[in-house]
Amino acid sequence: METFIVKRDGTREAFSMEKIQRAIAKAFLSVGSFATQDVITNILSRVSVTDGISVEEIQNQVEVALMAERYYTVAKAYMLYRQRHTEDREVRDKLQFLMEYCDASNAATGSKFDANANVENKNMATLIGELPKSNFIRLNRRMLTDRLKEIYGKELADKYIEMLNDHFIYKNDETSLANYCASITMYPWLIGGTISIGGNSKAPTNLKSFCGGFVNMVFIVSSMLSGACATPEFLMYMNYFIGQEYGTDYFKRADEVVDLSKKRRTIDKVITDCFEQIVYSINQPTGARNFQAVFWNVAYYDRYYFESLFGNFLFPDGSKPDWESLSWLQKRFMKWFNRERTRTVLTFPVETMALLTENGDVKDKEWGDFTAEMYAEGHSFFTYMSDNADSLSSCCRLRNEITDNGFSYTLGAGGVSTGSKSVLTINLNRCIQHAVKNGMHY
């Protein structure tokens, strides 16, 4: 019966003993020695080849056999030979990828490892970001399997790699060393600017510096993440700076003209211009993320969620957040953003509505009705409903128990701060197909 081996590209090929003999002979010649047939036979007697064995496994056995026969210099030469060929293959694969990427019809088609990334354009920036992804995948898998072996043993570590390769699971941040996503508190930025996270801007002092500084802060944080950056306090802080300039009752005078320039803008127009500056800036691709836009999340609250999270919150001047004006601002932003999306494609922010429930219904009827109204108008956002305001969700899957800070991300302290690393997605379709094919119950 003919024996087949598995090549590096996954194809099967008939096993050839002559190829191994030639490789061993070349290794001896490279160190100025000569391998007789008896020597080669003794070495090969230690190599076991079975049907379906990989090329790498055969070569590993040859290395061990050379060491066992005490041909240490030859074994070293053989190892170096394998390493050079590995490097040559990697360079060849990179060149092949370059050609295929240039010929691809779009960035998703050209992406070999991360086709679902937040990339819209195929250009040099996205190409540069794609090239090292295969190396990051190998590094991430090595670090994680080493940790799995340490905790659970080799069998589970091997099973993890098998499930990845067979597409039963997908690891969201394998192509980067960065954490996947984070929900951050903005308070360190409010009192110290971006200096604590590597920037050089000072704390915001007015509405204009808040808008520009907020965009810079989100870009800096997002450059250190491979996924989303959530800012649950965004509108609360913006509301504070609007109140500093126009008074906490500004929402009652939204039609009042406050701009003495030729534009004669009202308070409402000033606010929507700030919305426009922030949202359109953050939706632009950035070089720090390989020409991807920042993945940005925000949160809205009903009165009870707000009071639970920020009831004891104080701004640097000692003032407390004002719910009435914030409630108006949240609604204004949702209305504006929903209408703006009819004019152009705006992916971010991803919005989450946090509603407290009681006896199976929303506790804050006003915000329950407004949520239904926004859905009726075609707005797209997440809704997180909980009977305990001790829990907060900042995006589609990220949930934080505020009373338990054991799972708290280090960019900030408090109920809104949390994060994730090594996020796994289960491929249910693949699991069901496998179960049906093998007559298993799923």
Task: Give the location of each predicted region.
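Charged, amphipathic alpha-helical regulatory modules used
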Residues: 1-102, 107
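Conserved catalytic cores of very large enzyme subunits
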Residues: 88, 94-442
